[in-house]
């Protein structure tokens, strides 16, 4: 039998983590897939030097090689072809995290009424340039290959280009930049493209008729962000948005969604305004929307979403998700089928894959927790323990790896609920907003959805209009 040599194609790199040793990374999008032991063995043989025809390798493993070629992952080569240094196997001695959602500053040039971190007052400040650079090194050395940058307003950092340069030099992809749009201009987009980065710009828009200006505390804020959306569309940068719903803008939901669609925005998440300490101090409870009213607003609106041609991908909290141009929908509240065995699933799939780093360097499951001062104290500062330890043995790691069976054990209401499987624990940040601020409490929004039979109400409302997927 003639000798056979294979080489991994250059976009692909071999990676491994604690408890997930068999990973295949794809450049430059930095997506990673985990495979079984035999497939990874076959991938490891694709080094340009190993004769894969040798009978010492099991037939089961050798039979995988032609499939890798068909899929464009590897190719047949001559002896001596070599992997690049980046392609060679790297094993990270910590648990896997896909993305770091990073507040690189707590400072902001706007005065939003509901800010989680009171950014107008810069309550959490920002880390020094040297510390930020060291954290990028740690992110790289822990195998985190994607970051999204937020704040405060991330673009107010004077060393923002240095951050982009350092991330890019380490092949870390910037997936999103969360901005208010004020500093989004041609020069910024040129700089990002120069480093090979083309992130989505996620910019909040809280309604037509001056509502965005009112919530953000800046004159012409609405005009500014719509121009930023237009510029990104012209330059080929994807855009997304978030809309905070309250008593003053609830009647503008349909109109505002259509405005975003007209400006090329590809997706929007709608949620009620968070009753942060700043919101309650500056605006008050009377301007908030209770969950019961919120669901009725959503229920009234969803037929119009389809009537208006599904202008963007839309998420109405956990109540509804519809894709741009699609005639079907799904309900994020519905995590698992009623008969599924999900007891060993983590409390939150998003939190298990995405680390949130606060402006002071605190490791949190999500940005929403940054408004709960007492809860934050339970989680580590990466500047004190280091990222590797934080992703190995910490209160942060313990929480994001907590399983549903543990929630059901400590929360008897959830544990005995007939909807517990479909709900799958719902949202822990939402649970914190209920009286008692209990991280392992009930998510009142999910309780209302299931207990109030909104699944049936939604089906009836969309009968003949759209099908649930």
Which residue stretches match the model-derived regions?
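Short Fe-S-cluster ligation motifs
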Residues: 135-151, 441-469
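C-terminal accessory region of radical SAM enzymes
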Residues: 292-335, 362-363, 367-418, 462
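Radical SAM/AdoMet-radical enzyme domain recognition
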Residues: 117, 129-150, 157-288
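Conserved small-residue-rich
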Residues: 91-152, 354
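Local cysteine-cluster metal-coordination motifs and their immediate loop/turn environment
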Residues: 107-117, 365-368, 412-430
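N-terminal pre-core extensions flanking Radical SAM catalytic domains
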Residues: 1-120
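Short, acidic, Ser/Thr-enriched surface-loop or helix-capping motifs
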Residues: 27, 357-358
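Short, small/polar residue-rich loop motifs at catalytic or cofactor-binding pockets
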Residues: 348-352
């Amino acid at each position: 039998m003639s000798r056979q040599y294979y080489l991994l194609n250059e976009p692909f790199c071999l990676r491994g983590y604690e408890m997930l040793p068999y990973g295949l990374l794809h450049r430059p999008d930095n997506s990673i897939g985990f495979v079984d032991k035999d497939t990874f063995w076959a991938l490891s043989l694709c080094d340009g030097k190993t004769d894969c025809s040798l009978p010492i390798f099991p037939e089961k493993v050798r039979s995988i090689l032609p499939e890798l070629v068909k899929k464009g992952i590897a190719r047949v080569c001559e002896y001596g072809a070599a992997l690049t240094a980046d392609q060679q196997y790297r094993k990270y001695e910590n648990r896997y995290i896909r993305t770091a959602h990073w507040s690189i500053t707590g400072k902001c040039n706007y005065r939003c009424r509901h800010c989680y971190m009171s950014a107008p007052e810069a309550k959490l400040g920002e880390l020094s340039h040297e510390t930020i650079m060291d954290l990028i090194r740690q992110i790289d050395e822990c195998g985190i290959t994607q970051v999204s940058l937020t704040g405060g307003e991330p673009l107010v950092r004077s060393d923002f280009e240095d951050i982009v340069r350092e991330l890019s030099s380490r092949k870390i992809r910037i997936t999103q930049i969360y901005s208010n749009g004020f500093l989004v201009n041609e020069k910024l987009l040129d700089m990002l493209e120069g480093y090979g980065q083309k992130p989505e710009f996620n910019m909040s828009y809280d309604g037509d008729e001056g509502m965005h200006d009112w919530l953000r505390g800046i004159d012409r804020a609405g005009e500014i962000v719509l121009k930023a959306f237009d510029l990104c569309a012209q330059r080929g940068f994807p855009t997304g948005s978030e809309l905070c719903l309250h008593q003053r803008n609830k009647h503008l939901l349909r109109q505002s969604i259509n405005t975003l669609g007209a400006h090329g925005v590809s997706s929007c998440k709608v949620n009620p305004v968070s009753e942060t300490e700043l919101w309650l101090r500056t605006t008050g409870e009377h301007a908030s929307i209770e969950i019961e009213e919120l669901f009725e607003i959503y229920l009234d609106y969803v037929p119009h979403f389809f009537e208006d041609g599904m202008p963007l991908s839309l998420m109405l909290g956990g109540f509804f998700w519809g894709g741009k141009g699609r005639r079907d929908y799904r309900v994020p509240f519905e995590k698992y089928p009623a008969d599924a065995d999900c007891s060993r699933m983590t409390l939150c799939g998003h939190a298990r894959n995405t680390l949130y780093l606060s402006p002071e360097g605190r490791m949190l499951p999500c940005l929403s927790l940054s408004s709960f001062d007492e809860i934050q104290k339970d989680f580590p500062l990466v500047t004190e323990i280091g990222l590797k330890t934080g992703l190995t043995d910490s209160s942060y790691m313990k929480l994001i790896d907590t399983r549903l069976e543990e929630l059901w054990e400590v929360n008897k209401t959830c544990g005995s609920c007939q909807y517990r499987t479909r709900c799958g624990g719902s949202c822990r940040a939402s649970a914190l907003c209920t009286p008692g601020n209990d991280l392992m409490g009930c998510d009142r929004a999910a309780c209302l959805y299931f207990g109030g039979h909104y699944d049936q109400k939604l089906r009836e409302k969309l009968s003949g209009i759209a099908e649930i997927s």
